[in-house]
């Protein structure tokens, strides 16, 4: 199935130096992938030339005159950057010219712009950011990772539905398990929002595992972990910090003496395999679930390999009909939008 992905070629810390090599590698590996590079035409053409590439049937340029800065406010991006590479890429999804959009740009601006242009699916009050984390059993999808600091029980139910349908489509699991992140596994634990969300999830048609604790995330206890954006973002950043610390400790210990250096040399194949399993680039690409279009956010500091994974994630979501599955499940659950809680669009 042919898929067309619009790429914000100017977004992120490194812009076209990362996005264009990633796009070229992505279309080489996926014969059914088409890419639209959105941004300043002269800059994109120069980067293509540097990579000994040109436009063609599967790769074309869509000119945009403006760029959203990484520190620009969502309000400024919406009001003052109507011809930004970010917004034009999202507009291509709205018009149907592209089936998905990928950007490494400013998260707040991307969420606000995507919400403004694409709107939310019927039954979804507010989009959520879903990301992938490695586990002992494979990987887990976690949401929300920062879009909604405060949530109602109904919002958490919506997140669970979206996350479950994403996993069902992309991982080809018929009934993925859903866990509600809490301070204990017992039903009586947690604040009122989490308790009420648990009741809604138990009454839903989802495969609800129950409450899970932080240590369950990396055990792979469930396929989906649901929480509000405040908790999710703290958990994510804590995990990133821990991974960096472990990596630094390993390097320090192996450099301690000639004997430890020799041990490091002997252990190199194992260490490489270990590093690959935990390589954050393999899990790059957070999905903005709940919109009337596929939007994937790459880490701003991503290199070309990491950005390529984000492109692949967007293509897989489009190819496997994630939006249709979410819409169908929302209708089954008879959900209606609830009052919005504070999120990135209200910042």
UniProtKB/Swiss-Prot annotation:
Signal peptide: none
Iron is among the record's keywords: no
InterPro entries assigned to the protein according to its UniProt record, in alphabetical order: FA_synthesis, Phospholipid_synth_PlsX-like
Major place of residence: cytoplasm
Annotated metabolic or biological route of this protein: Lipid metabolism; phospholipid metabolism
EC number in record: 2.3.1.274
Pfam family, one: FA_synthesis
Gene3D superfamilies named among the record's database cross-references: Isopropylmalate Dehydrogenase
Function: Catalyzes the reversible formation of acyl-phosphate (acyl-PO(4)) from acyl-[acyl-carrier-protein] (acyl-ACP). This enzyme utilizes acyl-ACP as fatty acyl donor, but not acyl-CoA.
Full protein name: Phosphate acyltransferase
